Amino acid sequence: MAYPERDLIVDPRSGFCKSNSTFYSKRNPLCLPPNPSLDVTTFISSQPQRGTTAFIDASTGHRLTFSDLWRVVDRVADCLYHEVGIRRGDVVLILSPNSIYIPVVCLSVMSLGAVVTTANTLNTSGEISKQIAQSNPTLVFTTSQLAPKLAAAISVVLTDEEDEKRVELTSGVRVVGILSEMMKKETSGQRVRDRVNQDDTAMMLYSSGTTGTSKGVISSHRNLTAYVAKYIDDKWKRDEIFVCTVPMFHSFGLLAFAMGSVASGSTVVILRRFGLDDMMQAVEKYKATILSLAPPVLVAMINGADQLKAKYDLTSLRKVRCGGAPLSKEVMDSFLEKYPTVNIFQGYALTESHGSGASTESVEESLKYGAVGLLSSGIEARIVDPDTGRVMGVNQPGELWLKGPSISKGYFGNEEATNETINLEGWLKLGDLCYIDEDGFLFVVDRLKELIKYKGYQVPPAELEALLIAHPHILDAAVIPFPDREAGQYPMAYVARKPESNLSEKEVIDFISNQVAPYKKIRKVAFISSIPKTASGKTLRKDLIKLSTSKL
């Protein structure tokens, strides 16, 4: 454990310093490169390449070795610079389903000092147009199927081998290249490129917007380099075979599987789209050792364990990494009962913190039930009372603030949101109600904006949700505030029942009332086929709140 100032007196057990009310990471110090002109692609390529295969397409079996990867990254960058005219600061949009070539595009673009941004492939044309109007991309990498969602006349590189004239006629875009052809073309030999600084913007990914509108998060080369440095320091992530189960337009998917895994020498099996059976088939076929999952997928693995283990050989699987929401003791115990040879690790981070926050990195740490782990390398934390602004100490709840080299510079074109979220000292206000215990473990109580205010009491939805999904007839659940004239708000549950279940509203209400204080009782239940979530597995409470009040 290392601290920035030598005269600080820090409790080695909790990591807390009383003199400045700051918690420090107990992990190894983060080793960052001193070169101010080092771009993140060069930093990744400079790491020792221990592995052979970088990426595998799960559906076709097509492989991309590490040597092939860096060869085509250089070729695509050369084409972008000399033929398309991409320069430092230009924005390049990736609108594509998962593919082994997304990392190629991402690394090529950032090596030029240009900026990578992504869009959700499920978004409508109007939603994509709004994002394009804000980010103003010079170029879009997309497929022939998705090209019609783009505005006419925008420059496009196709990531599939469709007839470019047909695509231009049917969608109106201007095709300036085919990715497969760029990857085959020998480099020009002219290496003159713009000088890139670590403080330059490398990426601009849009936050999930679970509590409001989506915002473009600015990521510098320094932010991403800090992420990669932390990733390769996590020795348990080296030389593994991952299955990419999440969309690569999302920050976790892009950072972990287009950057971190490349630097660590691991192999990534990429699913073009998620399906539980597709994931299990990939584990069996490619002998995958680790899965990164959102909590709902973990629950699905528990519920279908007997059938899945009978159908697939999962003996290679050793680890599951889970993020998006803390796991309850009941869920963890159920998983370990069904999959006794697989260890669970948890992680906690935001798009704005680039994979840094807290995590469990050993079996012993994972046994700290309810905790999301110890603070990440290079991260400092404060717990701040949201009402008084007083900085809190060990085991005292408040809003979590984080600071460190991985913290974003802010939101693109949104100074108001930046100032609300990141203060002048660089502290990122996460909006989560948390506490850090005497051993330095971080516990997430709930989203501050999502706390239900019932007659002056604060009710954390996550606590009730953990109880609900422990019910044998409940597949998934979400709890929201429902407006009430007398109480202000009360807890309402949306419940997705398991197939064949006839669970009633009264049974749900009684199930919870027997386990919680009176002010935490659920007083209204609605049944729904599935709980709406973001690509990363976070519950879209704003959609449920809108649904619940639409009939008022």
From Swiss-Prot:
It comes from the Eukaryota. A motif (Microbody targeting signal) lies at residues 550-552. Its cofactor is Mg(2+). It is found in: Peroxisome. Keywords: ATP-binding, Ligase, Magnesium, Nucleotide-binding, Peroxisome. InterPro entries: AMP-bd_C, AMP-bd_C_sf, AMP-binding_CS, AMP-dep_synth/lig_dom, ANL_N_sf. One of its GO terms (cellular component) is peroxisome. SUPFAM superfamilies: Acetyl-CoA synthetase-like (SSF56801). Its main location: other. Residues 347-411 are annotated as: SBD2. It holds the Pfam family AMP-binding_C. PANTHER family: 4-COUMARATE--COA LIGASE-LIKE 3-RELATED, LONG-CHAIN-FATTY-ACID--COA LIGASE. Both substrate-binding domains (SBD1 and SBD2) are involved in the substrate recognition, and are sufficient to confer the substrate specificity. This is 4-coumarate--CoA ligase-like 3. It comes from Arabidopsis thaliana.
